[in-house]
Amino acid sequence: MQRRPFDSEMELFRDSARKFFQQEIRPHGERWREANIVDREAFLKAGAQGYLCMWADEQYGGMGLKDFRYEQILIEENAFHGDSGYFISLHSRLVAPYLGNFGTDEQKQRFLPGAISGETILAVAMTEPDAGSDLAGMKSRAVEHDDHWVLNGSKTYISNGINADVVIVAAKTHPENPHGLTLF
């Protein structure tokens, strides 16, 4: 496997990210862990630095940055500085791509600009009280009704859920098929 080392531009980015995590994240980490919530201000500050959803297209306010090494730098610096709940990675690399890759144009226009700026906090709801993270054992159901869907079920351990503005919810749409899941 050929290693693609970080170039000088990436090292400048790392220096900037390191300063951000030292000044804006590390001092609050213990308080956030005790309270089980990351301050909304952290998302706004990360957005102001351009650290949220860097992959997103420029038309939504992103940088259109496809090189994962920049994200890798953020992940490394976040871990090195106390890992205050994965707020950047969960928001930008787990939840937002569902919108970016599968959302309608209207959903992208509505939600991505705020996710990029940090004004809109994203969460994902998959884990259930009786099924845990076993998605095949999920009990939540979604049934199509006229021009919308009706969701029924329970979720727990919703990462970023306590302060989320938008929550992606997984539910079974084809209960007979263990893979018959849809994200809403």
Language-model segments: which ranges?
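Intrinsic disorder at enzyme termini
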Residues: 1-9, 142
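Residue-level signal for inorganic ion chemistry
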Residues: 10, 21, 74, 104, ...
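Internal helix-loop-helix
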Residues: 48-119, 160-166
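Short beta-strand-to-turn element immediately C-terminal to the catalytic PLP-Schiff-base lysine
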Residues: 101-103, 143, 169-172
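A short, Trp-centered hydrophobic/proline-enriched beta-strand micro-motif
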Residues: 118-126
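Cytochrome P450 C-terminal beta-domain/meander region
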Residues: 134-152
